[in-house]
Design a protein with these regions (language model features):
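N-terminal helix-turn-helix
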Residues: 1-74, 79-80, 238, 242-243
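Short, structured helix-loop boundary elements
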Residues: 1-4, 23, 58, 62, ...
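Short, acidic, Ser/Thr-enriched surface-loop or helix-capping motifs
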Residues: 54, 102, 203-205
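Amphipathic alpha-helical effector-binding/dimerization core
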Residues: 56, 60-155
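Cysteine/selenocysteine-centered motifs that mediate thiol-based redox chemistry or coordinate metal-sulfur cofactors
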Residues: 151-153, 157, 237-245
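Acidic, low-complexity proline/glycine/alanine-rich linker and hinge segments
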Residues: 158-164
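Extended hydrophobic
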Residues: 164-239
Length: 245
C-alpha cells in the first residue's frame, strides 16, 4: 500500500507543477529517496500516467490522467446540463461542438457532439488543449485576471503551427481584449490550415466562466453563414449558463 500511496502523492504533486519536475525535485517534495521516486515514475510512465520531456528530462502528467478526469466529469451537473443543448447546436450548424473546462491551470475537452468531420484536431474527450492557439483556451484567458493570463502565455511553448498562428504576447493580449468586447473567440486557420474554431463562455451563478462552448468548422469563406453559427453558439451557451445557475 505504501507504493500506491506514494504514486498517488506523486501524481498530486505533478498536478500542481504543470511545467514538470525532475526526479530530484519530486523526491524533495515527497520527502522520499530519489531512487524510490525514480521507480515510481518509471511505473507511472509505463502506464502512460506521466510523460518525460526528452530535453529537460522532467516529468509531468500524461494525457491518460486527463482522460480519467474527463470520465469523472462526465457525470457532473455541467456536462449533463450541456448535453442536450450541445446536440441541438451541432444539428443546427452541422458542425462538431465541444465543451471545455479549465481546472488546475489546464484546459481540456470534457464532452463532444460530433457532426461532419469527426477526425478534426483537438476534438477528443480528455484532450488537453493549448491556451494560446485554441478558441476555448483564449476565452478562458480573456475572462481571467490579465496578469494570470499573461503568466500562462509566458509558460506555454507558443509554436507557430501554421503561418497564421498568433504567438506574440502583444498581439495575443490585444486578441483577449477583442474577445471580451465581442463575447466570443475565433481561431482562423491558426491551429490547422483550412480549419476555423469559435468559442464563447458559459457563466456560473457568480458570473464567472464555468466552461467554454466551441465548434470547429472547415473554412468555406461564407461569412454570413459563419455569423449565423456564432449567434447560435452564443444562444446555446447562454441556455447552458441558465441551466447551471
Amino acid at each position: 500500500m505504501q507504493l500506491v500511496d506514494r504514486a498517488l502523492s506523486a501524481l498530486e504533486v505533478l498536478s500542481r507543477n504543470m511545467d514538470g519536475l525532475s526526479v530530484t525535485e519530486l523526491a524533495e517534495q515527497l520527502d522520499i529517496p530519489a531512487s524510490s521516486t525514480h521507480r515510481i515514475l518509471t511505473s507511472l510512465k509505463g502506464n502512460h500516467l506521466v510523460v518525460q520531456d526528452a530535453q529537460t528530462k522532467k516529468y509531468r502528467l500524461g494525457y491518460k490522467i486527463c482522460g480519467i478526469a474527463a470520465g469523472v466529469v462526465k457525470g457532473s451537473v455541467l456536462t449533463q446540463a450541456a448535453q442536450t443543448s450541445m446536440q441541438k447546436l451541432a444539428e443546427k450548424i452541422d458542425r462538431n461542438v465541444v465543451l471545455c473546462i479549465m481546472e488546475h491551470g489546464v484546459a481540456m475537452n470534457i464532452a463532444c457532439s460530433e457532426r461532419g468531420d469527426s477526425n478534426m484536431y483537438m476534438m477528443k474527450i480528455g484532450h488537453v488543449i493549448p491556451f494560446y492557439s485554441t478558441s476555448a483556451g483564449r476565452v478562458f484567458m480573456a475572462y481571467m485576471d490579465r496578469k494570470q493570463a499573461l503568466e500562462i502565455l509566458e509558460k506555454e511553448t507558443r509554436t507557430k503551427t501554421t503561418p497564421n498562428t498568433k504567438t506574440g504576447l502583444q498581439e495575443l493580449n490585444a486578441e483577449l481584449d477583442r474577445i471580451r468586447a465581442q463575447g466570443y473567440s475565433v481561431i482562423d486557420e491558426e491551429l490547422q490550415l483550412g480549419i476555423q474554431g469559435v468559442a464563447c463562455p458559459i457563466f456560473d451563478i457568480n458570473g464567472e466562466p464555468a466552461a467554454a462552448l466551441a465548434f470547429t468548422s472547415l473554412k468555406d469563406g461564407n461569412e454570413e453563414e459563419m455569423q449565423k453559427r456564432i449567434r447560435l453558439l452564443k444562444a446555446y451557451a447562454e441556455e447552458i449558463s441558465e441551466a447551471i445557475r
